[in-house]
């Protein structure tokens, strides 16, 4: 999911390289990484394998940077095992890493190919997280739509959610700028 809503988010593409040297060699973004993903120390210690992926976030449409194809973020050697840890005990789970660090996307899950390979499950003895993952996948964001300004009734409906002081504690609310003086007065008076 794009952190920038609307059409701006449609400019984003996420590319994921699996732990496969052939896929890595053919991947458009291989020069942004030192080596192909493989098996993390965490998975190796549990006798599991092939849990690492590389993730890049790209300004595919050029709307964010002005240049199509600009790599915005890189996440090397992150794991698809949900319990993956680095040597210092911090998480190395791809979903956690992306969600904590990305300025452009929020990762809600894995596609069906990765889910079928065990993405999002814990690393257990004998797990091989890469069966069938033979090429990089690109996920281009779509369906974002720009919205117009909120109407007076939409603003009032939103503020109504905060009216019961016994249910919701709010110190203050700020009225948005409205298109006309009459609308502004209506919103301010409702507060």
Stretches found by the model and what they are:
Residues 1-191:
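Surface-exposed assembly/interface segments
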């Amino acid at each position: 999911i794009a952190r920038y809503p609307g059409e701006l988010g449609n400019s984003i593409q996420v590319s994921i390289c699996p732990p496969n040297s052939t896929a890595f060699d053919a991947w458009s973004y291989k020069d942004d990484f030192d080596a192909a993903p493989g098996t993390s120390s965490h998975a190796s210690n549990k006798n599991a394998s092939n849990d690492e992926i590389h993730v890049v976030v790209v300004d595919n449409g050029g709307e964010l940077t002005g240049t199509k194809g600009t790599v915005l973020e890189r996440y090397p050697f992150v794991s698809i095992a949900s319990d993956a840890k680095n040597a210092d005990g911090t998480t190395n789970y791809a979903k956690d890493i992306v969600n904590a660090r990305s300025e452009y996307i929020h990762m809600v899950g894995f596609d069906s190919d990765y889910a079928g390979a065990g993405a999002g499950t814990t690393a257990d003895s004998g797990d091989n997280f890469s069966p069938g993952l033979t090429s990089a996948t690109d996920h281009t964001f779509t369906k974002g739509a720009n919205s117009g300004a909120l109407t007076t009734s939409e603003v009032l409906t939103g503020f109504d959610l905060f009216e019961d002081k016994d249910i919701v504690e709010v110190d203050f609310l700020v009225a948005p700028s409205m298109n006309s003086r009459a609308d502004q007065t209506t919103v301010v008076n409702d507060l």
